[in-house]
């Protein structure tokens, strides 16, 4: 596996509440268990604290634990991601694209005040040149035992050739105490020169 350490110091002069110091560790990789199977793993921990002119005093952590199995062209993963809350001030990622991480229905582009726990499972495959992916999320709060809802995401991507790719994506969020039921669908094409 690969161990990565990182530190990000954000000093936003016109949005002081987003000024934070962030330090973390990530360990990710895989181990072959047979000629056709590989166990995948990712562990990550980060701490976020107020920084510079941030008017709030807080400390919240980020946790990720994910395991998976890649076998015969299929990939299965299960994981838990937690963005903690420190008494209503949650771990935030103002420069991140949470669309890619916490569900394609975009219900968690900003971490809720009570934090976010995302328990997810995914299954992916490639067949006849098409990449398929299905992801199920179950969302809850870090504090106060709130259920936020669940989401199912489906993706298909087909590279026609080295220059053209088409894809389709669908997300269905079922609200349970946060937001409203939301369905989104995308069709797209990509051209590479």
Give a label for each model feature:
Residues 91-104:
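Acidic/polar loop-and-plug regions of large Gram-negative outer-membrane beta-barrel proteins
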Residues 183-192:
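Outer-membrane beta-barrel channel domains
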Residues 102-110, 114, 171:
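Extracytoplasmic loops and strand-loop junctions of Gram-negative outer membrane beta-barrel proteins
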Residues 1-88, 119-121, 126, 132, ...:
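Signature for the C-terminal beta-barrel architecture of outer-membrane proteins
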């Amino acid at each position: 596996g690969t161990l990565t350490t990182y530190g990000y110091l954000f000093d936003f002069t016109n949005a002081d509440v987003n000024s934070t110091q962030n330090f973390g560790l990530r360990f990710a990789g895989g181990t072959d268990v047979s000629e056709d199977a590989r166990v995948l793993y990712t562990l990550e921990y980060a701490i976020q604290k107020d920084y510079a002119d941030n008017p709030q005093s807080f400390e919240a952590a980020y946790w990720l634990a994910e395991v998976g199995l890649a076998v015969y062209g299929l990939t299965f993963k299960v994981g838990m991601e937690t963005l903690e809350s420190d008494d209503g001030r949650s771990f935030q990622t103002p420069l991140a694209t949470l669309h890619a991480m916490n569900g394609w229905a975009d219900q968690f582009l900003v971490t809720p005040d009570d934090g976010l726990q995302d328990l997810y499972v995914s299954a992916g495959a490639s067949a006849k040149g098409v990449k398929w992916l299905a992801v199920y999320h179950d969302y809850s709060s870090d504090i106060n035992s709130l259920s936020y809802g669940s989401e199912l995401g489906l993706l298909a991507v087909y590279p026609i050739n080295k220059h053209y790719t088409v894809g389709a994506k669908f997300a269905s969020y079922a609200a349970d105490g946060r937001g409203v039921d939301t369905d989104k669908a995308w069709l797209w094409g990509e051209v590479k020169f």
